[in-house]
Structures are given as C-alpha cells and as structure tokens.
C-alpha cells in the first residue's frame, strides 16, 4: 500500500492477532498454533509501509487452549478485534490515542501457509503433530497417506506411550485407529479421505468394512 494512502486520514490502523513483534506477516494465527504458543494477543497498531511494525494503540491478551484450532482462534480474535477497533477510533477522535513503539526484540515472521507444509511427519512428537493439525484445520488441512490417498486429519488426540512398532504404522480396530509417532500414538477423530466428505473416524471405518 503506498505511503500516500496512509496520509489521507489522520492515520490508518490495523488489527493484528499476535504479540508483535512475534509473528509479523500473513499467517500469525496458524503460526502461533503450529509453534505451540500458549497465548497470543489482539493488537491495534498504526499502519506503516513496513510490515506490521506500526506503533501500538491498544492490545488484548488471549489464551490459546490446547483444544483450539486456527478457525476457532480466528473467530475469537475477530470478535475481540472489532471491539478494540471501535475503542481505538473513539480514542483517535478524542485525541487520546497514545501509541507505543514496538520493540524490535524477538521478531519472528508468519509467512503464508504452503501446502507443502501440510504432510504429517510421524517422526515428530505427538504435541508437534497435534499443533500442526490444529494450525492447519481451516486450510489446507494436515494429511497423511492412507491406502494410496490423502487422508486429512482435522481433529485428533495424542496418548504418550512406549511402543515397539514402526513410526507411522497404522493400527486399526472396529471403531477407531491410531498412528505411531515418536513418543506415542495419534488417534484421529475427524477426517476426510481424498474425494470424500469430512466425517468422524467411526463413520469412516463403517464405510471401509
């Protein structure tokens, strides 16, 4: 956006869902979940030509629960962000806005999500895999290979346990299945086989029998 656009009003503002300068960029919600962050924030900042580097007008801290996926965090952030925006506009109109410069310590960047990131690596820990599933639940969906097709996993559970089977091995029973990972097993709950609708694992397995 050209600097000339920013100079038309008193200044332009931006809603950003992260604790800046952590996760500057296009995908802060997904990146924060994928990284296993326990909390984030909704910030109202001044827009500048530099990426997400504007001064802070308002902020609201927000916990990221272990069950929250990117879509759910987005919805919570949008609701809080709309309220903060109205508050910020009111402060600006009254001349009471006191913007604080961002620190440049701890800068990280939230690059756009690439489809190449979405394949699950079961050599990773259960927590890392669940974070990937939660972070990509909205788009594009974390996936594994199942009988030669992509199987997206949108919700899963992890149980930490020792096992002596191959990493990535799928263990099926009547109503569920688990996949061995580095330090336990991943149990998918909501899935979507390539070319099919999203469904529970129980319904999926009924169709396989």
Feature-to-residue mapping (PLM):
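Donor/substrate-binding cores of folate-linked one-carbon enzymes
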Residues: 1-109, 116
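Short, surface-exposed, charge-dense and proline/glycine-enriched linear segments
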Residues: 2-12, 32, 47, 73-78, ...
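Alpha-helix N-cap/helix-start motif
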Residues: 22-26, 122, 197
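Sequence-level motif detector for i,i+2 pairs with an aromatic at +2
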Residues: 39, 53-54, 115-117, 148, ...
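Short, charged low-complexity intrinsically disordered segments located at boundaries
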Residues: 61-64, 107-123, 156-165
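Active-site-lining helix/loop region of Rossmann-like oxidoreductase modules
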Residues: 90-145
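An anion-binding loop in the catalytic cleft
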Residues: 123-209
């Amino acid at each position: 956006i050209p600097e000339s656009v920013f100079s038309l009003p008193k200044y332009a503002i931006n809603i950003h869902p992260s604790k800046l300068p952590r996760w500057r960029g296009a995908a802060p919600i997904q990146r924060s979940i994928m990284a296993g962050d326990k909390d984030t924030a909704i910030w109202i900042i001044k827009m500048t030509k530099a990426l997400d580097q504007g001064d802070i007008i308002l902020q609201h801290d927000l916990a990221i629960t272990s069950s929250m996926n990117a879509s759910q965090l987005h919805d919570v952030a949008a609701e809080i962000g709309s309220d903060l925006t109205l508050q910020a506009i009111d402060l600006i109109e009254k001349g009471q806005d006191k913007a604080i410069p961002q620190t440049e310590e701890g800068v990280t960047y939230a690059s756009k999500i690439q489809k190449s990131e979405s394949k699950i690596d079961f050599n990773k820990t259960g927590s890392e895999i669940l974070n990937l599933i939660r972070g990509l639940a909205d788009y594009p969906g974390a996936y594994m290979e199942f009988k030669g097709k992509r199987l997206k996993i949108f919700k899963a559970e992890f149980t930490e346990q020792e096992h002596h089977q191959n990493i990535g091995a799928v263990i099926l029973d009547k109503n569920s299945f688990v996949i061995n990972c580095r330090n336990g097993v991943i149990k998918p709950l909501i899935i979507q086989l390539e070319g099919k609708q999203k469904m529970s694992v129980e319904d999926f397995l009924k169709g396989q029998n």
